[in-house]
């Protein structure tokens, strides 16, 4: 892979964290009719963002065959910082990401590695859900 901006930061969030957020929202919608029609963002705190290079280093520990090179190109505009404002979800729903950014990257890379090598994804998915439930 070619990496253009290794020091750019990216939010890391696992799909299980997002699904958990929607389950919390659904339960709150049932209890509080004032929330009907409200919109919510679910994303990690900006302080949890990782640099692209750090995401790659974590990924390489899980999948040693991963290779990349840095090639700074100016022809593509790319934001150095990406983020969602999830303050409303945190305040009203008392929601937060349960997985760290490092756990998110590790679980995601582990899943894709097993998928790539045609391993039992259902079993791994169940293990990862159990891991999340124990957080």
Segments (PLM) and residue ranges:
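C-terminal substrate-binding subdomain of Rossmann-fold SDR/epimerase-dehydratase oxidoreductases
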Residues: 2-135
């Amino acid at each position: 892979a070619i990496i253009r901006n290794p020091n750019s930061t990216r939010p890391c969030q696992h799909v299980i964290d997002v699904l958990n957020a929607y389950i919390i929202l659904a339960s709150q919608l049932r209890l509080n009719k004032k929330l009907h029609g409200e919109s919510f963002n679910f994303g990690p705190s900006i302080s949890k963002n990782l640099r692209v290079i750090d995401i790659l280093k974590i990924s390489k520990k899980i999948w040693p065959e991963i290779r990349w090179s840095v090639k700074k190109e100016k022809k593509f505009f790319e934001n150095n910082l990406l983020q969602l404002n999830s303050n409303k979800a945190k305040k009203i729903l008392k929601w937060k990401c349960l997985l760290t950014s490092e756990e998110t990257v590790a679980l995601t890379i582990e899943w894709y590695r097993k998928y790539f090598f045609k391993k039992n994804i259902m079993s791994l998915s169940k293990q990862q859900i159990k891991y999340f439930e124990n957080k």
